Amino acid sequence: MTTATSLNELQQQIRDRYDSLSKRLQQVSRYVLDNANSVAFDTVAVIAERADVPPSTLIRFANAFDFTGFNEMKQLFRMNLVEETASYSDRARLFREMESEAVPETPLDILQEFARSNAQALQQLAARAEPEMLERAVQLLADADTIYIAGLRRSFSVAAYLTYALSHLECRPILLDGMGGMLREQISRIKARDIVVSISFSPYAEETVMVSETAASVGARQIVITDSQISPLATFSDLCFVVKEAQVDAFRSQSATLCLVQSLVVALAYRLGEGK
């Protein structure tokens, strides 16, 4: 079992393993599933008291899911709470309230932290890239009649860039933007010889999941870019690129995802050029 990287992933692991846990750990399971805000904000002592278990049981619970301690597990609850806060101002305030250490606040501090974190994320992307997956992704794009691209909310900028870049090649890219509330009408045109590129990160956009479900139902090939192998999008994918983005405080970057997308487009340009 791999360590969960999002709250949704952890909650699914807890539900899947619930029956195999001891009674004490089942007790903790029920509490953490039903009281996400408490786990995010409260101390270990308070959580243990409210769950009616010794603090050591919380540590055993975290260890059972491959965390080094309960505080490490708490981070998933805290970041999920922050991510569900739409306002960036409220998000920054929440993070300061939850963070015991000093939070970088000057523009230079924030720039340096993002630069450092993005550099690490890009190095990790290159180190973990699988040549066969990249080759297959480029070939799927080259063979497609039409390339449908789905990426909403914070993933929209990546989807829009991919559409823009592909429009400069001999491709037929279509951005599934749901303009005028017509997403269902847009995706109804997807056919078996098309490719769907879906981009979404936790918390996953329901509309993007709907696109993947529809594409699967008509037999279209799918390339997914997401943050977990158990992302709801991964189920429908022919190729799934798991990208770990840089994160500074409560804010995630998009540098690694954009790097991957740009690399695929440029590789496709070379591939199409060879065919002339």
What are these regions (language model features)?
Residues 130-140:
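Short, acidic loop-to-helix structural element flanking the phosphoryl-transfer center
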Residues 15:
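Flexible phosphate-sensing "switch/lid" loops adjacent to ATP/NTP-binding sites
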